[in-house]
Each structure stands twice: as C-alpha cells, then as structure tokens.
C-alpha cells in the first residue's frame, strides 16, 4: 500500500528555514520525511532533490566511518542557497538492513572486510533499499522535474523508473577523511558510485 501524507510544519535549522513533512505507510507504520524549501507554490522548472537514507551514526553522531552526515549538511546548505529544493529522508538505516545489522557489519569492517562483503557475510544484500515512496512524496510537493543530488546511479534509475524526469545530476563530494577512504573506494569500485579519484 502506498505511503500517505500525515503532517507538515516549519523547521528552522542551522542551515536555514525548511518545511518538514511526514509520510507514513499505513500498514507497516514506517515513516519517511520530506525536508523542503521554496515549494509553497508548484515549481515551474527542475527542483534540486536529494534522496537520503537514514544514517543514525553519520547524521546524528558525526561518525567518520561514512560520508552521510557531511552529505546531508552540504545538501541543506545547497538547497538553502538555491532557495528551493527537497531532501527525501528515507528511514532505511544501514542501506536498508537496519541499525542492529549495520553495527554487526561495522564489527566485520573492523576486522578488515569492506562494506559490501560485511553485508554479504551476514547473508544480507549489499543494498536493500527501495525507492518506490519517492514518487508519492514528490507528487505531493508538485515536483515533476528534478536535478538529483547524488553519486549513486541506482537512485537516478530508480526515480526514472517511477516516471520522474531526472534532468540533471548534481555531484556531491564531501566528507572524505582517513577513516572512510576505504568505504568511498568500495562505493566507487564495487557499487558503481560516480566518484572520480580526484574528486576529493
């Protein structure tokens, strides 16, 4: 069953004022969030959009094992400066495997396994996320064309498969540090993320 719009409110942040809207799956109770700016009226052109999966360790605890927190903050800054945009914040912790399994995967990474192999050793997919809720959320916000802020070609294709017109990709190369260099290399070499070796 598709997710449903539940509520919206203004949200002042360190990066500017946004609107926060909550959507919920009526069967599972799963909640997803749209953080938007400048969409009080239907947009007349492409809108900056980021599809960001929840990362408690990176987004809330400033973990250096990934680049999720810096990506989220950089996107908020970019959208605030542009005056218009949306972050679809999907509650898909650990690329969809959940927080407990994510920490189990972290323990395997501590032993030298990369982020893909760690998931596979737990008999879990390298990426278990889904994106079918995105079209409903964007349709509610009257967004028809997007400039997608991503390095992940799977997200581009997922939105296109839902009939969303992705007119451009906006690269996002922030957050590299000594603790996540192997993680970024794995995303580039094993998950086909569109990083270049000289991006950082």
Swiss-Prot record:
Gene3D superfamilies, alphabetized: GTP cyclohydrolase II (3.40.50.10990)
Record pathway: Cofactor biosynthesis; riboflavin biosynthesis; 5-amino-6-(D-ribitylamino)uracil from GTP: step 1/4
Disulfide bridge partners, by residue number: none
Cofactor binding annotation: Binds 1 zinc ion per subunit.
GO biological process, alphabetically ordered: riboflavin biosynthetic process
A Pfam family that the UniProt record links to this protein: GTP_cyclohydro2
List of residues binding Zn(2+): 55, 66, 68
GO MF terms, alphabetically ordered: GTP binding; GTP cyclohydrolase II activity; zinc ion binding
Domain of life: Bacteria
GO cellular component: cytosol
Active site, UniProt feature: 127 (proton acceptor), 129 (nucleophile)
Binding site for GTP: 50-54, 71, 93-95, 115, 150, 155
Reactions catalysed, as given in the entry: GTP + 4 H2O = 2,5-diamino-6-hydroxy-4-(5-phosphoribosylamino)-pyrimidine + formate + 2 phosphate + 3 H(+)
Record flagged with keyword Metal-binding: yes
EC number: 3.5.4.25
Necessary cofactors: Zn(2+)
Record keywords: GTP-binding, Hydrolase, Metal-binding, Nucleotide-binding, Riboflavin biosynthesis, Zinc
Similarity comment: Belongs to the GTP cyclohydrolase II family.
PANTHER family for this protein: 3,4-DIHYDROXY-2-BUTANONE 4-PHOSPHATE SYNTHASE (PTHR21327:SF18), GTP CYCLOHYDROLASE II-RELATED (PTHR21327)
Role this protein plays: Catalyzes the conversion of GTP to 2,5-diamino-6-ribosylamino-4(3H)-pyrimidinone 5'-phosphate (DARP), formate and pyrophosphate.
Protein name: GTP cyclohydrolase-2
Gene: ribA
């Amino acid at each position: 069953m598709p997710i449903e719009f539940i509520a919206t409110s203004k949200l002042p942040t360190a990066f500017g004022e946004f609107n926060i809207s909550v959507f919920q799956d009526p069967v599972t109770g799963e909640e997803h969030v749209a953080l938007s700016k400048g969409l009080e009226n239907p947009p007349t052109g492409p809108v900056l959009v980021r599809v960001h999966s929840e990362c408690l360790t990176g987004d809330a605890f400033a973990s250096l094992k990934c680049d999720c927190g810096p990506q989220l903050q950089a996107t908020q800054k970019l959208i605030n400066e542009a005056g218009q945009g949306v972050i679809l914040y999907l509650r898909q912790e650990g690329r969809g495997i959940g927080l407990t399994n994510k920490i189990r995967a972290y323990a395997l990474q501590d032993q030298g396994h990369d982020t893909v192999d760690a998931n596979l050793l737990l008999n879990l997919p390298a990426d278990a996320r889904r994106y079918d809720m995105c079209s409903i959320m964007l349709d509610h916000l009257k967004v028809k064309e997007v400039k997608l802020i991503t390095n992940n070609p799977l997200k581009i294709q997922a939105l296109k498969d839902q009939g969303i017109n992705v007119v451009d990709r906006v690269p996002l190369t922030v957050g590299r540090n000594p603790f996540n260099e192997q993680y970024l290399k794995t995303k580039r070499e094993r998950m086909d993320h569109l990083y270049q070796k000289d991006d950082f």
